[in-house]
Every structure is written in C-alpha cells, then in structure tokens.
C-alpha cells in the first residue's frame, strides 16, 4: 500500500510553491502512527526539526494492520495545512517508505511483552531492524542520509540496522540518548536553581538503558563547576544517577504508558543539532565507536559530542575518567557487548 498526497498552497507563507526557498527533503518515520510517531510528525511538519524554511515530504512506514490508523494521522496532517509539508507517503513496505530518504527516524520496535526474556526481545527486534537496514541500503539517499534509532534497545538496534546496510557509512547511523541527556539537564537545573541552558558539558556515556552513566564531572553551571556547586556526592550517586537511569520506568509507573512527547522532543533535538550544529556546546549521541575511551569498535555507544555548523559531529577528546566513572563506563560497555553477542547470528 502506498499513497502520496501532494500540496500546492497559494499562501504567502508557502515560499516553495512560489518558486522560492529550498527543495524539499524526505523524512522517513517508522511506527508513524504510534505514540511517539504521532508526536513527531506534527512537529517535523511545522518546522521544529529542520527549520521554518525547509520544505519536507513525510514518508511514513507502518505495519499492515496499522495502515488505517496511519490514514487518520495523514488526514490530520492535511487538516493542519502546514506550509512546509509538500507530501505524505503512507506505506507498509520499508523500501517504499525509505525511497530517497534524507532522514530516517526508526521509532517502531517490538515492545517487551509479559513473560518475554530480554534475549527474545533482542532477537525479535534484530529481525525488524535487519530488514529496515537492508531497505535503507537499497533505497535511501546514501549521500545525505542521517538515521536516528529511537526504538529500544536503541543502541543495539542501530548496530543491527547499520550492519545490514553495508553501502552506507556506519557514522550515518545513531541511537538516541538525547532523552537521557535532557532528563539529566532538567534534574541538574532543578538542583542548582538554574535554567537548563545554564548547564553545560554534561553528558551520557554508553547504553540507553539502566546502565547508562550520566556524568557531571566536566559539567558547569553558569561557568562554575557542577561538582563544586552541588557539593553533594551522595546526592549525585544515590539520587541523580538512578533518577536519570530509571526515569523511563518511573514515567510508565506514573502514567501507565511509556514516554512519548518527551521522546519525540528529544528526537527533534537530536536531529536538529546533527543537522545545524551545537554552537560549540556538548550534547550526547550514541554513535559508531572507533574505540574512543575504550569503547569497543563497532558498538553504538553514547559519547559527549560537539556538532559543527555543517552537521559533522566530533567526540569530545582528552577527558580523564576517575575510578567511579570508569567503573560505570565499563558496566554499560559490557552490557552493550552482551547485547551484541545475543544477536550475533543475525549480524552480517
């Protein structure tokens, strides 16, 4: 099933229809009618991700049984009359949804059901993301493509997709730890009585899981050391770190559903910064490891990164991890190795 809806508004805001501005880019989203996908689509269409001067075509992938729901979402997108939205593709075929894609947000994933072991979940998702990796390899725009994996286990799903796309640079794949990063910023701002924009040089190391390591040791608040400003290592170790690590579970316990709006917002932040840069500021991205800081080559591991204004990321170099940090780093590294081992027979 494949449906394309095109627009040609005549409003003054529609600069592209009047022959001005940029050509549209193609943004593919999997699990498009799900909770996170629903939150994402409207923000992308409004220009929150790529800017108010960038026309887009949304290319939505769903399961066959969810195509009617996707039709309803597409109707809502139509009804918003977004000037930047030049078309919508609805498909249950990965190669169609990824055709010519410049951006791909892989949101849809198999959730863990009652009684399911983690190894079973890994293998179920390995099958999904191997298919999607092959489809990206065959039909996406390899020269411009940026892939963000949101569906969990995100780091290992990114690894699987990338390994199944041998003709695409593995550095064009990433997994999302920006939600963890944003959660940490909010906790630190609250603790220090400051704005989130006052917090700098904070980062997430490792896996998007309960082993992730939110690291404040290099951080500053209004230019002053976070460690010195907080001056409470017990709070950092016993409150802050577990709160960030377990925030997703806490939200499920509170609302009965997993994070959706905050996850979508983090995905927007991740892709916007990866495209336009971070103005010299640190952010956290799970990216292809070349062995930096001892993270095994080939893993998708969260590092502190800076992105330049051309969209090229660089891992922050020269950081010295203390013993506590190194222990946390090693724990999350070992978990990622274990996950990779659990799906090794499905990796090319």
UniProtKB/Swiss-Prot annotation:
Q: Where is the transit peptide?
A: 1-9
| Compartments where found | Mitochondrion
In terms of Gene3D superfamilies, this protein maps to: Lactate dehydrogenase/glycoside hydrolase, family 4, C-terminal, NAD(P)-binding Rossmann-like Domain
Top enzyme class: oxidoreductase
The protein's annotated catalytic reaction(s) are: (S)-malate + NAD(+) = oxaloacetate + NADH + H(+)
Catalytic residue list: 208
Presence of keyword Transmembrane:
no
UniProt-listed GO biological process terms: malate metabolic process; NADH metabolic process; oxaloacetate metabolic process; tricarboxylic acid cycle
Give the residues the record marks as binding substrate.
112, 118, 152, 183
> What Gene Ontology molecular function terms does this protein carry?
L-malate dehydrogenase (NAD+) activity
Domain of life per record? Eukaryota
Asked whether the keyword Lyase is assigned, the reply is no
Task: List cystine links.
Answer: none
Query: Under which EC number(s) is this enzyme classified?
Result: 1.1.1.37
| Recorded family membership | Belongs to the LDH/MDH superfamily. MDH type 2 family.
Q: Which NCBIfam families match?
A: MalateDH-SF1 (TIGR01759), PRK05442.1 (NF003916)
Q: Which protein is depicted?
A: Probable malate dehydrogenase 2, mitochondrial
Organism taxonomic ancestry: Eukaryota, Amoebozoa, Evosea, Eumycetozoa, Dictyostelia
């Amino acid at each position: 099933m494949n449906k394309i809806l095109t627009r040609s508004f005549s409003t003054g805001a529609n600069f592209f229809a009047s022959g001005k501005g940029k050509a549209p880019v193609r943004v593919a989203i999997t699990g498009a009618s799900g909770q996170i996908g629903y939150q994402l689509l409207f923000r992308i269409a409004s220009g929150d991700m790529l800017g108010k001067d960038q026309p887009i075509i949304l290319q939505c992938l769903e399961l066959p049984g969810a195509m009617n729901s996707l039709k309803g979402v597409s109707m809502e997108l139509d009804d918003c009359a977004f000037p930047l939205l030049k078309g919508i593709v609805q498909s249950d075929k990965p190669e169609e949804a990824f055709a010519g894609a410049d951006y791909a947000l892989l949101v849809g994933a198999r959730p863990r059901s009652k009684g399911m072991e983690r190894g079973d979940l890994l293998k179920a998702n390995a099958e999904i993301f191997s298919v999607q990796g092959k489809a990206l390899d065959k039909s996406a725009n390899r020269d411009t493509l940026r892939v963000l994996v949101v569906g969990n286990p995100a780091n290992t799903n990114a690894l699987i997709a990338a390994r199944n796309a041998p003709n695409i640079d593995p550095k064009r794949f990433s997994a999302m730890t920006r939600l963890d990063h944003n959660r940490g910023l909010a906790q630190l701002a609250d603790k220090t009585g400051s704005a989130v924009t006052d917090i700098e040089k904070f980062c997430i190391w490792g896996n998007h899981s309960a082993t992730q390591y939110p690291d404040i040791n290099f951080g500053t608040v209004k230019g002053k050391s976070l460690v010195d400003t907080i001056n409470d290592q017990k709070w950092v170790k016993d409150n802050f770190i577990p709160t960030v690590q377990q925030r997703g579970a806490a939200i499920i316990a509170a609302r009965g559903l997993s994070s959706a709006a905050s996850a979508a917002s983090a995905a927007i932040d991740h892709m916007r910064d990866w495209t336009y840069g971070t103005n010299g500021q640190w952010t956290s991205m799970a990216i292809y490891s070349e062995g930096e800081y001892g993270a095994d080559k080939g893993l998708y591991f969260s590092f502190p990164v800076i992105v330049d204004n051309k969209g090229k990321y660089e891992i922050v170099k020269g950081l010295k991890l203390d013993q506590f940090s190194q222990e946390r780093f090693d724990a999350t590294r070992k978990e990622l190795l274990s996950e990779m081992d659990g799906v090794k027979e499905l990796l090319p």
